[in-house]
Amino acid sequence: MVRIGLLGCGNVGRIIATHQDGFTVEALFDRLPDHAEELARMCGAPAYADFQEFISQDFDICVEAASVLAVREYAPKILENGKHVLILSVGALSDTNFRKILLDVARSQGKKIHIPSGAIMGLDNLKVGGISRIDSVLLRTTKSPASLGMQVSHRTLAFRGKANECIKQFPKNINVSVALALAVHHDVDVELWADPEVDRNIHDIFVSGEFGEASIRVVNHPSPDNPATSYLAALSVLSLLKNLDSPLVIGS
């Protein structure tokens, strides 16, 4: 059974901690201690107000469900303390210098950095970009204006550009673009739309390359209590954790 420490006790953290299947939650940490203590009462795992005390506990992998800033602050320390790390706020890895530092630490410690599929599907197949030519990648994401902190009366283009620039402007909303870029080993063109007519998050992905062409549409229900996050993102973490201890692993 995989033992995890949970860094981040907000909405996604609550979903993870209350759906333990194939793993157990051994420790909780949040920069807001009240959040960790509340989740501790729900799932029975101990909460820690001090990060060093948290990371010293006996678990195999630390699951980050907090923020891009939390990844930058804590991910290197997690690896240095001999833990694998699962990063949900993958937007932090859009910084190439930080990504290199993190990979160097992981190699030196013999540990893994796990990136879940998050709010989209198809990443497993699109990893062929690491061994085969990719010509173009477009991600068109549509969300409610409220989830983007906008007030508009009609469908409005909030951003058009590259993934590494989009994540700077919307660090809580478009982590999926960075996960896609890492998977396909290619720049991702991003269109982010605010649409008052939608109540779900929509991701349209268009990829062409040596393998052929792929078009993927994912229409997600927002995560409970947080319209900025897709419920599928939390479920993808649960799936990854369950697979870590499974004798049968499907996909590359």
Swiss-Prot record:
<keyword id="KW-0560">Oxidoreductase</keyword>
<feature type="active site">
    <location>
        <position position="203"/>
    </location>
</feature>
<dbReference type="GO" id="GO:0009435">
    <property type="term" value="P:NAD biosynthetic process"/>
</dbReference>
<dbReference type="InterPro" id="IPR005106">
    <property type="entry name" value="Asp/hSer_DH_NAD-bd"/>
</dbReference>
<dbReference type="GO" id="GO:0033735">
    <property type="term" value="F:aspartate dehydrogenase activity"/>
</dbReference>
<dbReference type="InterPro" id="IPR022487">
    <property type="entry name" value="Asp_DH_arc"/>
</dbReference>
<dbReference type="GO" id="GO:0016639">
    <property type="term" value="F:oxidoreductase activity, acting on the CH-NH2 group of donors, NAD or NADP as acceptor"/>
</dbReference>
<keyword id="KW-0521">NADP</keyword>
<dbReference type="GO" id="GO:0050661">
    <property type="term" value="F:NADP binding"/>
</dbReference>
<dbReference type="InterPro" id="IPR002811">
    <property type="entry name" value="Asp_DH"/>
</dbReference>
<dbReference type="Pfam" id="PF01958">
    <property type="entry name" value="Asp_DH_C"/>
</dbReference>
<feature type="binding site">
    <location>
        <position position="119"/>
    </location>
    <ligand>
        <name>NAD(+)</name>
    </ligand>
</feature>
<dbReference type="InterPro" id="IPR020626">
    <property type="entry name" value="Asp_DH_prok"/>
</dbReference>
<feature type="binding site">
    <location>
        <position position="175"/>
    </location>
    <ligand>
        <name>NAD(+)</name>
    </ligand>
</feature>
<comment type="pathway">
    <text>Cofactor biosynthesis; NAD(+) biosynthesis; iminoaspartate from L-aspartate (dehydrogenase route): step 1/1.</text>
</comment>
<dbReference type="GO" id="GO:0051287">
    <property type="term" value="F:NAD binding"/>
</dbReference>
<keyword id="KW-0520">NAD</keyword>
<dbReference type="InterPro" id="IPR011182">
    <property type="entry name" value="L-Asp_DH"/>
</dbReference>
<dbReference type="Pfam" id="PF03447">
    <property type="entry name" value="NAD_binding_3"/>
</dbReference>
<keyword id="KW-0662">Pyridine nucleotide biosynthesis</keyword>
<protein>
    <recommendedName>
        <fullName>L-aspartate dehydrogenase</fullName>
        <ecNumber>1.4.1.21</ecNumber>
    </recommendedName>
</protein>
<comment type="function">
    <text>Specifically catalyzes the NAD or NADP-dependent dehydrogenation of L-aspartate to iminoaspartate.</text>
</comment>
<dbReference type="InterPro" id="IPR036291">
    <property type="entry name" value="NAD(P)-bd_dom_sf"/>
</dbReference>
<comment type="similarity">
    <text>Belongs to the L-aspartate dehydrogenase family.</text>
</comment>
